[in-house]
Amino acid sequence: MFLLLQILYILLFLNLADTSDDEYRLLKDLREGYDPMERPVSDHMKPVNVKLRLILQQLVDVDEKNQVITLVVWTQYTWNDYKMKWSPEEYGNITSLQIPFGTLWKPDILLFNSANEHFDSSFPVNMVVSNDGNVLFAPPGIMQFSCSLSMTWFPYDEQVCYLKFGSWTYGKKLDLRIDDADLPEGHKMDLQYYVPNGEFDLISTPAFRKSTTFLDETYVELYFHMHLKRRTMYYGLNWIIPSILISLSNILGFTMPVECGEKVTLQITNFLSIMVFLAMVSEVAPPTSESIPIIAAFFSFAIVILGVSICVSLITVNIFYRHPKMHRMGDWTRYIFLEWLPWFLLMSRPDHVFRKPKREKKKEEEEDEESNAGGKEEESELISQKQQRPRLLVNSQIVMDSTIPYLEEVIGYLKVFKAKLDDDEEEEEEILNWRFMAMVIDRASLFLFTGLIFGTTFVIFAACPNLFSADQIIETEPVIT
């Protein structure tokens, strides 16, 4: 048994030695007379046909502030080298070889809109050569490329970016084409190994080929587009809904009584909270004046509304604590805020009848005094008639004359007391009128600012072109190897 194992081991070793020897001979024969600077074409007038296939693995990051997108991509180049052909039967049935980077000719294809500090970030891997002369070069790399990101509809935005590939020096000597074999309709990137991104959905990956002229030389360029759509759940739950709730809680401040002392404090706190959300948007958006993100416009309108509501609340507090000795309510103010606006807002004061101001009462009293002047003349005539009565009434008249001054004095005190009570009652009435006016302004502000917030929110977000659109999202299953 042991002898059999030794024989098998020797045969295996001899087979490996033969294979290694065949591979060595093949490499030696292929390298003989080969110059990696020479284009692999038999006719120098013909271009080298190179196919490019992008294998997208992951969308790493979308940097809106710096307008840079980071991808993990495998760039697969294929071309035919006529000097790399051999007959497998002559070399131990070897059909492919792994040749180190730099040994063979390689197209100088670069990502033109690269934002990487090293420009070309691909890793120099080996080249795979087949016996028919086909060369496969698939270097992986982390690509960073610039893209003009439009933040107008952020966070309900869609972005279309492209990767621009082309030869740096060969011009028309290199015919660059898109390798889209076995790819779905409308997709020019290989998404077999794509890992979905948590912030953006990949909608489509079209591509096209374009020829340009530079310094009297024709160059072929390939544009690989990426249609991205932002996922909005995070921003809706953490930005938009909280800001709407903060705005509504600010409106509820109009239902708080002025005496509690926290009315304006609540609104100022909400105002500062919205300012924090606006600062968060400024951290994400690029410092450009081309467009304002729609969510920044929403926060700006919310800040304006909250600022105006704070001013209205301060005016309400001022009106609430007004005193009739310091401020006089005008006739139009009284009519609008104590009669018409309460009627319009369905507000009423229980068991209350609006009284005329004191100045109007004085006018009526003056008119009453003028009308009573004739009564005093009649009273003097009656007194003269009494003086002509018989002497039987003299004693009673004397008694009445002696008590009249005391009665007049008592009546005078009663009038003063009544006037004091009337003044106090009217003053209290005016104080209540000012307070009721403040309540009316609060109620009107409640309805007005509620309508403004809901109306502004609806108008702004209804303008989003893709708020309710349902694009077909590319979904890939994980590849298990």
UniProtKB/Swiss-Prot annotation:
Main location (coarse class): membrane
* Glycosylation sites recorded in the entry for this protein: 93
Protein localization: Postsynaptic cell membrane; Cell membrane
Record's keyword annotation contains Ribonucleoprotein: no
Q: Which keywords appear in this protein's UniProt record, sorted alphabetically?
A: Cell membrane, Disulfide bond, Glycoprotein, Ion channel, Ion transport, Ligand-gated ion channel, Membrane, Postsynaptic cell membrane, Receptor, Signal, Synapse, Transmembrane, Transmembrane helix, Transport
Topological relation to the membrane, as annotated: Multi-pass membrane protein
User: Where are the stretches annotated Disordered?
Assistant: 356-384
Q: Which GO terms describe its molecular function?
A: acetylcholine-gated monoatomic cation-selective channel activity; excitatory extracellular ligand-gated monoatomic ion channel activity; transmembrane signaling receptor activity; transmitter-gated monoatomic ion channel activity involved in regulation of postsynaptic membrane potential
Q: Which InterPro entries match?
A: Neur_chan_lig-bd, Neur_chan_lig-bd_sf, Neur_channel, Neuro-gated_channel_TM_sf, Neuro_actylchol_rec, Neurotrans-gated_channel_TM, Neurotransmitter_ion_chnl_CS, Nicotinic_acetylcholine_rcpt
Q: Could you tell me which residue ranges are on the Cytoplasmic side of the membrane?
A: 313-443
Q: Where is the signal peptide?
A: 1-19
* BP GO annotations: chemical synaptic transmission; determination of adult lifespan; monoatomic ion transmembrane transport; multicellular organismal reproductive process; nematode pharyngeal pumping; neuromuscular synaptic transmission; regulation of membrane potential
Extracellular face of the membrane: 20-235
Q: Which residues cross the membrane?
A: 236-256, 264-284, 292-312, 444-464
SUPFAM superfamilies (UniProt xref): Neurotransmitter-gated ion-channel transmembrane pore (SSF90112), Nicotinic receptor ligand binding domain-like (SSF63712)
**GO CC terms for this protein?**
acetylcholine-gated channel complex; neuron projection; plasma membrane; postsynaptic membrane; synapse
Stated family: Belongs to the ligand-gated ion channel (TC 1.A.9) family. Acetylcholine receptor (TC 1.A.9.1) subfamily.
Per UniProt, subunit arrangement is: Neuronal AChR seems to be composed of two different type of subunits: alpha and beta.
Reported function: After binding acetylcholine, the AChR responds by an extensive change in conformation that affects all subunits and leads to opening of an ion-conducting channel across the plasma membrane. Nicotinic acetylcholine receptor in the MC pharyngeal motor neuron involved in pharyngeal pumping. Has a role in the determination of life span possibly via calorific restriction which affects growth rate, although this is independent of metabolic activity.
**Name of this chain's protein:** Neuronal acetylcholine receptor subunit eat-2
Gene name of the encoded protein: eat-2
